[in-house]
Amino acid sequence: MARPRSQEAHKAALDATVELLLEAGVEGVTLEEVAARSGVAKSTLYRHFESREGLIAKAARGCVIEHPTPDTGSLADDLRYLFGRFSHTEDEKRLSELLPLLIDAAKRDPEIQAIVESVFAERKRPLRTVLQLAQLRGEISRELDLDTALAIVVGPFTYRRMVEQREVTDDFIDAVLNGAIAALTSTADVEQPVG
């Protein structure tokens, strides 16, 4: 376990990295700039993160909150729970601001591309589990490709945040999930209960 002072330095470096990413993009993040902004020695940054990319990766992943995967017995309730959580935490909002910057930089930098893939994998994990549970319950077809199902569910939110650069409101969440759930459950292997 890291010592308290070490933990404080770690947090200060990650916070400074996120601030720099938001202000200057990936190209604006240097170990020198993070050291100056955070008050953490460059040697400490190298010891904790090994490289600029390691620092960016840790900062981006730090914005991904691990949400417990719900299992309410209802695809609709599980998705509403997750998307409610995704859109209402500060770290999640920061992540949605960071992702377009990282995606743009990923076109030119394979290490940044790996970071983006890692962040998306973390974000998709609980959604994939919820969809798998829905398949097991017969709410959606067992033959439905889960990557396609994820695209149906996540696509509108990604478009809203990254292309339109608009906030994801509760009304938007409800409208999208109503449509996505209707589409997904239309593939069901069993008749859906009413109510």
Placement of each model-derived feature along the sequence:
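C-terminal peripheral helix-coil segments that are non-catalytic and often amphipathic
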Residues: 81, 125, 129-136, 163-195
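Amphipathic alpha-helical segments used for helix-helix packing
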Residues: 59-60, 90-117
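Amphipathic alpha-helical packing segments from all-alpha helical-bundle domains
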Residues: 93, 110-137, 147
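Short hydrophobic/aromatic patch on the recognition helix
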Residues: 38-49
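Hydrophobic alpha-helical connector segments
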Residues: 67-97
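Basic, helix-initiating cap at the start of DNA-binding domains
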Residues: 1-37, 54
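Short amphipathic alpha-helical segment with a characteristic S/N-K-E followed by hydrophobic residues
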Residues: 13, 28, 51-56, 66-67, ...
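Hydrophobic alpha-helical segments that form the core
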Residues: 141-163, 173-180
